[in-house]
Amino acid sequence: MSKIYGFGNALIDIEIQINEDQLSSIGIPKGGMQHISRDRKDYLLDNYKNSIKSMTPGGSIANSLFAAESFGASTCFSCSLGDDEYGQLFLNSYEDRNKIFFNYSDNPTGVCLVFVSPDGERTMASNLSANNQLSAECISPSLLESCEYLLFDNFSLATDSGNQTVDYCLDTINNEVKVCFGLADSGLIVENLSKIKNLSNTNLHCLSGNKLEHETLDQYTSLNYKKRLVSNGEKGASVNGYQLSAPKVDLINTNGAGDSLIGAFLALEGQMEEEQALKEAINYSSQVCSVNTPRLK
């Protein structure tokens, strides 16, 4: 059984169904992600309140760990939450409170507005809020020191406190821990490029992201990794160039699919051959595309 420690954004995903014209008016490139202010979040929520389809706990690393648990992994997630209704909703998604280690922030719990267009593509607007207070104090040293995998992503590089958390974790773990990094968003790669380059001295076990994210990274820099996991939508995914197709599903939206792919793969790679682990992870993440939330219940 794999032990995976992850840290990152704790968000409430609010899925909103919109048409292409409405998406254009929001001003975020289709399929992309943009950080927004609290006022902008409140405005969009009020404007599209009648189009809300679901409100569920999310956040990329939290979603990945949820998928890993589905395949028998032991996980722990560290984050920063607001002491509010959304924070309680996030906590309630953990039947075992020992699997989440967090601090309360004076700011509200973070929210991600997930705009789903008719083709199932998701475009995101995130108000990080409490997540800006993610810090080393949110980390459990004992659980971190005993983990086999450390999982985090590019979103944590977007704030000074998040960067400090990354540095703390990388300095604390032993050399046997498999460090896994998610690229998260192509636009964020450019924004965080100098911080990503700081990871060049880290021997990553797995570098994950979608095809566009990997292509964007390759334009600017390179990282040291053992495995490169690339998701490619309905075409499937690949590990170090070994490509497998995805099964056909009734697509609702793609929110959480890439998160689930990495979580499932990390949980499975120690249980079976790599090709089989990739196949199982693709099948699982494809099923995530057929539900209205970023996680399979």
Task: Give the positions of each predicted feature.
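Ribokinase/PfkB-type carbohydrate-kinase core domain
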Residues: 1-30, 53-56, 76, 88-104, ...
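Short catalytic helix/loop segments, enriched in acidic residues and glycine
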Residues: 21-49
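Short, conserved aromatic-histidine micro-motifs
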Residues: 33-39, 85-89, 279-292
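Short pre-catalytic strand/loop immediately N-terminal to key active-site residues, enriched for Gly-Thr
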Residues: 48-56, 244-256
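Active-site alpha-helical elements of protease catalytic centers
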Residues: 56-78
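Short glycine/serine/threonine-rich phosphate/pyrophosphate-binding segments
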Residues: 59-64, 110-111, 262
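Conserved post-catalytic alpha-helical subdomain immediately downstream of the catalytic base
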Residues: 70, 247-297
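Alpha-helical transmembrane segments within multi-pass membrane transporters and channels
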Residues: 80-82
